[in-house]
Curated annotation (Swiss-Prot):
<dbReference type="GO" id="GO:0008483">
    <property type="term" value="F:transaminase activity"/>
</dbReference>
<dbReference type="GO" id="GO:0006782">
    <property type="term" value="P:protoporphyrinogen IX biosynthetic process"/>
</dbReference>
<comment type="similarity">
    <text>Belongs to the class-III pyridoxal-phosphate-dependent aminotransferase family. HemL subfamily.</text>
</comment>
<keyword id="KW-0627">Porphyrin biosynthesis</keyword>
<dbReference type="InterPro" id="IPR005814">
    <property type="entry name" value="Aminotrans_3"/>
</dbReference>
<keyword id="KW-0663">Pyridoxal phosphate</keyword>
<dbReference type="GO" id="GO:0005737">
    <property type="term" value="C:cytoplasm"/>
</dbReference>
<dbReference type="Pfam" id="PF00202">
    <property type="entry name" value="Aminotran_3"/>
</dbReference>
<dbReference type="InterPro" id="IPR015422">
    <property type="entry name" value="PyrdxlP-dep_Trfase_small"/>
</dbReference>
<comment type="pathway">
    <text>Porphyrin-containing compound metabolism; protoporphyrin-IX biosynthesis; 5-aminolevulinate from L-glutamyl-tRNA(Glu): step 2/2.</text>
</comment>
<protein>
    <recommendedName>
        <fullName>Glutamate-1-semialdehyde 2,1-aminomutase</fullName>
        <ecNumber>5.4.3.8</ecNumber>
    </recommendedName>
</protein>
<dbReference type="GO" id="GO:0042286">
    <property type="term" value="F:glutamate-1-semialdehyde 2,1-aminomutase activity"/>
</dbReference>
<dbReference type="InterPro" id="IPR015421">
    <property type="entry name" value="PyrdxlP-dep_Trfase_major"/>
</dbReference>
<dbReference type="InterPro" id="IPR004639">
    <property type="entry name" value="4pyrrol_synth_GluAld_NH2Trfase"/>
</dbReference>
<feature type="modified residue" description="N6-(pyridoxal phosphate)lysine">
    <location>
        <position position="265"/>
    </location>
</feature>
<comment type="subunit">
    <text>Homodimer.</text>
</comment>
<keyword id="KW-0413">Isomerase</keyword>
Amino acid sequence: MSKSENLYAQAQQLIPGGVNSPVRAFTGVGGIPLFIERADGAYLFDVDGKAYIDYVGSWGPMILGHNHPAIRQAVIEAVERGLSFGAPTEMEVKMAQLVTDLVPTMDMVRMVNSGTEATMSAIRLARGYTGRDKIIKFEGCYHGHADCLLVKAGSGALTLGQPNSPGVPTDFAKHTLTCTYNDLASVRQAFEQYPQEVACIIVEPVAGNMNCIPPLPEFLPGLRALCDEFGALLIIDEVMTGFRVALAGAQDYYHVIPDLTCLGKIIGGGMPVGAFGGRREVMNALAPTGPVYQAGTLSGNPIAMAAGFACLTEISQVGVYETLTELTDSLATGLRHAAKEENIPLVVNHVGGMFGLFFTNADTVTCYQDVMNCDVERFKRFFHLMLEEGVYLAPSAFEAGFMSLAHSNEDIQKTVNAARRCFAKL
C-alpha cells in the first residue's frame, strides 16, 4: 500500500470523505487522491516521492508557482511580528490601496477570509442596498457554498452529481433565479417576470466552475445593460479570474464595469483571503458606516495580507500577463495538435492563465448544456493516464486548469508529449 493510500484510509475515518473539500477526493475521476508533501515552482511532490507538473495550482492562487521566495519571505517576516491582532494594521491599508489601484472599479474594498465569504457578503450588500430579495445566477456557475448560491451550481456540485445540495431550504432557493450562461434572452425573461424584485446578477466573467467557458462578446455588456434597465446591481465574481485573466481582472479584459467585484485565490498569494468591493456609495452601506452587517474575526489578518501584498506586487511587473498568456497559448495549441494527430475530438478553451479541456465532437463549448454533453468517461481515463505520466490536472471534468509563471517551455513540451501518448491510448 502506498503512503497516499494509507493516509487516505486513515483520513476517511476522521474526515468526511477523507478530505476537507469534496473535489480533492477524486470522486469525479475515481481512484485514490494524492497526498502532497511539498511543492516548488510548477511541481508537486507527493508523500510517495513522485513529482508532478501541476496545472491545479491550489485551484488557482499559485499564479507565481509554489513556494515563491518573495511570498515566503513576506510571510516569515509577518509571522515574526505576530499571527493575528483583532485590530486594524497598516498592512490592511496598504493592501486595500493596492487592490483599489489595480482594479479601478473598486472605490473601496472589504477583506474577508474566502471567496464564499466574499460572494455571500456582496449579495447581502446588494440586497440591503436595493431593498430587493431575488438574485440571478447562471446554471453551472459556482460562487461558493452559501445556501442561496447552491442552486444549479457548478464545480464540486457538478462533480458530485448533485446540482442542488440537500440542506438548502426551499424558502432560500426560491429567491435565486437561474439563467443560462451566455444567453441574454433568458436573463431578460427573468427580469421581466420579476421587474421590481431582482437585487443583483452575480456572474463569473469566465465560467471556471463548469471547466472554462469564456463569455460570448455580447454577454457581459448585455448583463450590464439589463442591470441598468431594471435597477439591479451587477456583481462580477472574479474569485477565479481576478488577477489571472488580466491584472485588472476579466472585467478589464472584456471591458465591463460592475457595481461590485468579488476576489479570492490570487489575492491571498496562497493564504486564505477573499475580498469584495465596488462603488463607494454601495460599499458605504456596510457596517459600521451603514446598516448591512458583515464581520470576521480573522478578516484582514496580517499574515494573509503580507502574502497577498507580496503576490500582487510581483504580478504587477511589466510583461507578466504577456508571458502568462503565451505559456497558456502554447499549452492549448500543443494539446489541440496532439489530440488531432491521434484523432481524439477535443475542444480547448483558454483565456489568460486558465484553460479547459472538453472531450466532445462539438466545435465549441459555450454553456452548461454543452459541458454536460462532453465525454466525462474519456476525461477520467485521460486524467489517470496523465497522472501516470507525472502531470497533475484537475481531478474533475468540470474544473478549469491553471498556468503559472513558474511553468517553463520545457514543462509545457513535456505535458504535450505526455498528452500525445495518453491520447493514443484512449
